[in-house]
């Protein structure tokens, strides 16, 4: 309710329009499900002495599903006749989103220290990122049953969606030398 001075019900026993109770209880629903899955794998291999291979793999996926339905909300006048106070037309909207992110980081290094005091180290590596996403939205007006789904609506169908992706890749290297 807005303020404590606004009455909850009118003299006929209906909720008052000003209390917004009808809009809250009968105006529709919003439901959202979000799932995030992340995996990481990292290991170091030393196939021969002083040569190390580092591997790091990262993967993340996001899934999002939203459901929104707007129901026509009625208030009642002093003669107990209904009139629309919110959502002239009932409607349902469904939204789905998915994204995937993959990031490998692989590098190898070899180091050798000689008894004469010379130290050598070589590193080579690769790093990349790949991100893909897609979404789709569908909506329709005129809910015909108690079950608010796209299949139970009748007019003004709309849909939209899209895909996008980007990627990067890079190679790197380094040579180090020092003496004693």
Language-model features: locations:
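Transmembrane beta-barrel domains of outer membrane proteins
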Residues: 42-44, 56, 109-111, 174-178
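Outer-membrane beta-barrel channels and translocator barrels
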Residues: 46-48, 113-117, 180
């Amino acid at each position: 309710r807005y303020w404590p001075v606004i009455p909850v019900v009118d003299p006929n026993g209906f909720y008052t329009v000003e209390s917004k109770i009808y809009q809250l209880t009968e105006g529709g629903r919003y439901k959202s499900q979000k799932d995030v899955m992340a995996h990481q794998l990292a290991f170091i291999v030393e196939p021969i002495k002083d040569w190390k291979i580092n591997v790091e793999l990262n993967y993340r996926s996001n899934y999002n599903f939203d459901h929104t339905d707007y129901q026509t909300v009625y208030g009642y006048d002093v003669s107990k006749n209904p009139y629309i106070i919110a959502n002239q037309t009932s409607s349902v909207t469904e939204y789905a989103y998915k994204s995937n992110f993959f990031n490998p980081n692989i590098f190898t290094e070899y180091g050798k220290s000689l008894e004469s005091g010379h130290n050598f180290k070589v590193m080579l590596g690769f790093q990349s990122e790949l991100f893909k996403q897609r979404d789709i939205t569908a909506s329709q007006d005129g809910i015909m049953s108690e079950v608010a789904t796209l299949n139970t609506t009748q007019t003004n169908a709309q849909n939209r969606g899209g895909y996008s992706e980007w990627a990067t890749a890079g190679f790197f290297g380094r040579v180090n030398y020092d003496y004693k």
